[in-house]
Amino acid sequence: MHDEEPEKPASGVRTMNSVLSTLRVFEEVAQRQPIGVSELARCTEIPKSTVQRGLITLQQAGWLKVVDAERSRWGVAPRVLALGLRDCGKPDLKELADPVVKRLAAETNETVMLAERDGDNLVVIATQHTDQVVRVVLDVGTRVPLLATSGGTAIMARLDESEVEELFTHELPEFAQDPAPDFVALRRDIALTAKRGYALNGSSSWYRPQVSSIGAAITDPAGRPVATITLAIPDMRYSRAQEKTFAPLVVAAAAEVSRLLAES
C-alpha cells in the first residue's frame, strides 16, 4: 500500500503563483525597459494590481527601480549586473575592457559606455564618466534598443542584411521622444558605418535628444558583434572637429577589446 501524497495547501499554490507572476514582471521589465505599469499588465496579461505589487516587491529587494518618475516607468537596478551572471567559460568582457574604457575616457574627457548585445537591445555593463559639470549619465543596467543608438548602429553594420531587416520588424519600445527612427535613414547610416568603422548618433536622436555619440562594435573571436564602446557627448559641446579627433580613438578602443577577447 502506497502512501498518498498530501495535497498542497491552497496558500502554497497562491504563493507559487505570486512568485511566478513577480518573476514574469521582472523578465518583461528587463526586456522592455523603460516600461510602465499599464504596458506591463498588457504584455504579461497579469492584473494591473498584481503587476504593481510585483514591482514594489522587486524595488524593495533592489532588483528594479523607477527610471522615469514623471511617467512611472521602470527599469532594472545596478544590483542585477552585480550578480556577474555570464556564460560559464566565457571571459569577463567588463574586466577585459576596463582599462581600455578608462583610458578612452581620460583621452577624451567625455563619458564612455561599454554595452553588451542582448537580442534587440544593448545592456550597459560599465560606464566611465567625465569630471565635467555638464556630462552624459547612463546607469549600469540600462537597456536601449539597437535601433536607437550609435552603438546599436555599429552592431547592425556588422550583421547580415537579413538580420538587420528582421530587427526592423520587431516591436519598438515607446519613449518620450517621437517619432520612432526613420528606417530609410537608418539603412543609410548602417551602410556608412560599415564603410568607415564607427557610427554617429546626432542630437536629434529618438532615444537621447541633445546627446551626440560615437560608437564602434566589439567582435568575438568569430567576428560576430557582441558589444560596443560608445563615447557620449552633450550636444552643446559636440563638433565635427571632435568627430575627426575622437572617432579613431573609439574605433581603436573597440578593436583592442576585440583583440583581448580573441586572446583570452
Q: Positions of the model-derived regions?
A:
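Extended hydrophobic
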Residues: D182-A254
